[in-house]
Amino acid sequence: PVAIIGQNGAGKTTIVKHFNGILRPTSGEVLINGEDINNRSTAKWSKEVGYVFQNPDDQLFLESVRKEFEFGPKQIGMPEDEIQKRIEWVAELVGLKDKLDMHPFDLTSTEKKFCTIGAIIMMDPKAVIFDEPTCGQDVAGNIRLREIIRQLKENGKLCITISHDMKFVVDNFKRIIVMCKGQVLLDGPVEEVFAQVETLKKSFVTPPPITKVAQGAGFKETVFTTEAFMKVFEERKGK
């Protein structure tokens, strides 16, 4: 899984919308598995790269959760029996098993977000892009998101997530890309990226609180949990 972070206006959403042709480059090339993005329509690319909009209302348009789940797979020619099998699994995964016949706009804001996530996963793309999935989520929602990302990874899918929630980022992603003003400033393992204090300041990214405390205390190690902080603290105290 990969997280893309940076301040508002850094270009995060713009760049990921190029990954399945929602946007097209005005210069240069965007290659997906070596193929130019301009070689296919957005509809064709949706089989490869699924994009979950930040605002669910921009994505939902049918009269039931079930129909939202069925729509994409039908458009790409997925067999009906496979669609029905996937509905069972996806509905359970996103927590909407008992709400398949509800109108999406009768769902809570959190449930609507999971409805859009489910609709994209239904199409079985090789990569799934989440745009600010934690926005408006409670603790239970974040736990469910973590499980969704874990299962996607387990199934060999690439998960790319845009997020301002640094706690969620460090808990769930090993590779981090930092953007600022349309440029990639950092791209690497989470520990290395959050060790680049000055570059993070330039990109207006604030590390998780415990990480900031450790850096302020002069720790050379980059820590993300209280347990890791205390371990380093005790080791330093012992010296």
Give names to the regions the model predicted.
Residues S163-H164:
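H-loop/switch region of ABC-family ATPase nucleotide-binding domains
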Residues T199-K239:
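ABC ATPase nucleotide-binding domains
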Residues N20:
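Helix-to-loop junction immediately C-terminal to a conserved catalytic motif
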